[in-house]
């Protein structure tokens, strides 16, 4: 029940506007690396020193105007340049709605190609985040178009979607770099598993499908059972460490992240920054309502 409440709040534009004005003081600092690219760079440098890789995400989604989309696109380019300038072990992640997908597919494609051009210049990999189901088809279509132009482009497949395995099979000709995730949006039972067990079993089957295809696989999970399954699978099939990695979110299980890195696995941390943090933060609380305690602490300190 609480999960649905927080997912509903994540889509509330009035609360998003208030949170943006208030800043990350409402407890979000645990999960968000500050407001600026400079703060994100500082965070990634610290992670890199601990043996962790990163992917930087400038927070924002559902751009309501071309001006907003343009601003996000420019910030993405700035982030890529910062990654190169500071020699960070980091990639870039972005959401298509943040660069104008809801305004027009042409606008989002124009911005994406410009971002990828800069990424290619600086040899920085980029991942297109998957959003809610209403944007699913467009995201896969845009990924297919741009993957042929930019080799170091990945996208995300959500394990709670029934169709996920078939979509992975359809992409095999692209040799896709995929981040496999559980899925964090509120979706209808008509398209997504409504329960954790069904999602977890499907998640495991997707990991096996993608890894055994020989394509690069990022297993994005904080679940020890999924981690153990992946470890056993790669050991049984002698899959090289260069073909996969684990990913976790900044601020969640940091000690476990370091443990995996020390065990010799590539461990990448998703590092978001920016003022448009509310929707992202609410989804993190929806995944684990106990995180709501950090919101209360943030308010009581003021």
UniProtKB/Swiss-Prot annotation:
Pathway: Amino-acid degradation; L-proline degradation into L-glutamate; L-glutamate from L-proline: step 1/2. One of its GO terms (molecular function) is FAD binding. It catalyses: L-proline + a quinone = (S)-1-pyrroline-5-carboxylate + a quinol + H(+). FAD binds at residues 130, 158, 182-184, 221-222. Keywords: FAD, Flavoprotein, Nucleotide-binding, Oxidoreductase, Proline metabolism. Its EC number is 1.5.5.2. Substrate binds at residues 95, 283-284. The active site is at residues 129, 179. GO terms for biological process: proline catabolic process; proline catabolic process to glutamate. It holds the Pfam family Pro_dh. SUPFAM superfamilies: FAD-linked oxidoreductase. Induction: Repressed by FadR in the absence of LCFAs (fatty acids of 14-20 carbon atoms). When LCFAs are present in the medium, they are converted to long-chain acyl-CoAs, which antagonize fadR as to its binding to fadR boxes on target DNA and thus derepress transcription. Its cofactor is FAD. InterPro entries: FAD-linked_oxidoreductase-like (IPR029041), PRODH_bac_arc (IPR008219), Proline_DH_dom (IPR002872), Proline_oxidase (IPR015659). PANTHER family: PROLINE DEHYDROGENASE 1, MITOCHONDRIAL, PROLINE OXIDASE. Belongs to the proline dehydrogenase family. Converts proline to delta-1-pyrroline-5-carboxylate. This is Proline dehydrogenase 1.
